[in-house]
Design a protein with these regions (language model features):
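Mobile genetic element proteins and their domesticated derivatives, centered on retroelements
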Residues: 4, 23, 29, 48, ...
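Generic recognition of stable, solvent-exposed alpha-helical segments in well-folded globular domains
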Residues: 1, 43-46, 66, 70-74, ...
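RNase H-like two-metal-ion nuclease catalytic core shared by retroviral integrases
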Residues: 64-66, 70-79, 86-112, 153-156
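Surface-exposed, charged/polar loop-rich segments
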Residues: 92-93, 99-143, 147
Length: 167
């Protein structure tokens, strides 16, 4: 699964605000979101553990970006203990986690918006909202994958597979 964080900071990154941990399965597109009151390794480990228990399939690995909240000893030890492969994207490559970046917009941003959210009550409400929507998103909301991109003259032609639900 690809794993990424979405900031709910409004227009400014200063101060405290909520984060959404977004996990997307590469093969199926199954997506889970968890609201976090801060960006730290301990909260991420708790969220991954919670998500792992609710998945309808085993969690073989996590692919993360190069943030310090993901690349640390605590997450490495957790993944080693749970037999989860931990891989990271290439440095300075924004497009290495395209599946989860797409789901950040179509799931986390669509449900929570772009405004600033902070505080424990807001995190609790967001997690209730994510739990209420997870089955709809994964059982009934179809998505499709990009199969091929061709450049024909000055035009880009993209070919996608047939839309289907993650489950």
């Amino acid at each position: 699964m690809e794993m990424d964080l979405v900031a709910h900071c409004g227009r400014h990154l200063s101060g405290t605000f909520l984060w959404t941990l977004s996990l997307t399965d590469i093969a199926s597109g199954w997506t889970e979101c968890v609201a976090l009151p801060a960006r730290n390794a301990e909260l991420i480990i708790r969220a991954v553990d919670k998500v792992q228990k609710s998945l309808p399939f085993p969690l073989p690995g996590l692919d993360v970006d190069n943030g310090a909240e993901f690349i640390n000893e605590a997450l490495f030890e957790y993944c080693s203990a749970k037999c989860i492969a931990l891989t990271r994207s290439r440095p300075y490559r924004k497009n290495d986690q395209v599946r989860t970046e797409q789901k950040n917009g179509s799931v986390a941003r669509k449900l929570a918006g772009y405004g600033r959210l902070d505080g424990e009550p807001a995190a609790k409400a967001m997690n209730q909202m994510y739990m209420a929507n997870r089955l709809f998103i994964n059982f009934f909301q179809p998505s499709f994958k990009l199969l091929d991109t061709q450049r024909i003259g000055g035009k880009t032609v993209r070919r996608h597979d047939a839309p289907k639900t993650p489950y």
